């Protein structure tokens, strides 16, 4: 029996909706990364984008554990000499784009390269509870029920 290899034409992508309210960012990002890569499917093939489309709502209400809210720093470089910049998780969450915390966490759990970039395009993160993907009829995934450690009571 030969090893099963999924062909890109055979891929069936589902739409999944996740409410991030009260969920721990790292655990949520790990689950999302696995869904984007398709590792939860029996038809997983490493070189094929066979993951699902994931919609995350209420990203601003996701929770960081420990002192990460105040101490975790996000760095980037402008490209100019001495252009290293940093922001804390608190500044990002309270800023204009709080969904970036979840996006960055997932991005750093997905492989770097052309396939990883293509898989990241299947992730849609929204700070509030509204999203424009009702027509896709996404299936709701209750992450809090999967494991009690996935939530953090404030």
From Swiss-Prot:
This protein is one of the early assembly proteins of the 50S ribosomal subunit, although it is not seen to bind rRNA by itself. It is important during the early stages of 50S assembly. This is Large ribosomal subunit protein uL13. GO terms for biological process: negative regulation of translation; translation. Part of the 50S ribosomal subunit. GO terms for cellular component: cytosolic large ribosomal subunit. It holds the Pfam family Ribosomal_L13. Disulfide bonds: none annotated. Gene3D superfamilies: Ribosomal protein L13 (3.90.1180.10). It comes from the Bacteria. Keywords: Ribonucleoprotein, Ribosomal protein. The keyword Cell inner membrane does not apply. InterPro entries: Ribosomal_uL13, Ribosomal_uL13_bac-type, Ribosomal_uL13_sf. Belongs to the universal ribosomal protein uL13 family. The keyword Ribosomal protein applies. It comes from Rhizobium meliloti (strain 1021). NCBIfam families: rplM_bact. Coiled coil: none annotated. The gene is rplM. GO terms for molecular function: mRNA binding; structural constituent of ribosome.
């Amino acid at each position: 029996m030969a090893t099963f290899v999924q062909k890109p034409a055979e891929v069936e992508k589902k739409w999944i909706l996740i409410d991030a309210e009260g969920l721990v960012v790292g655990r949520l990002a790990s689950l999302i990364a696995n869904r984007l890569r398709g590792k939860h499917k029996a038809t997983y093939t490493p070189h094929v984008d066979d993951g699902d489309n994931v919609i995350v709502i209420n990203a601003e209400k996701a929770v960081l554990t420990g002192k990460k809210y105040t101490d975790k720093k996000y760095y980037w470089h402008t490209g100019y000499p001495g252009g290293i910049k940093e922001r804390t998780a608190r500044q990002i969450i309270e800023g204009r784009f709080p969904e970036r915390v979840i996006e960055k966490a997932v991005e750093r759990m997905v492989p770097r390269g052309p396939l990883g970039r293509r898989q990241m395009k299947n992730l849609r993160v929204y700070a509030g509870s509204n999203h424009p993907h009702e027509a896709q009829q996404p299936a709701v995934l209750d992450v809090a029920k999967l494991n009690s450690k996935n939530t953090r009571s404030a």
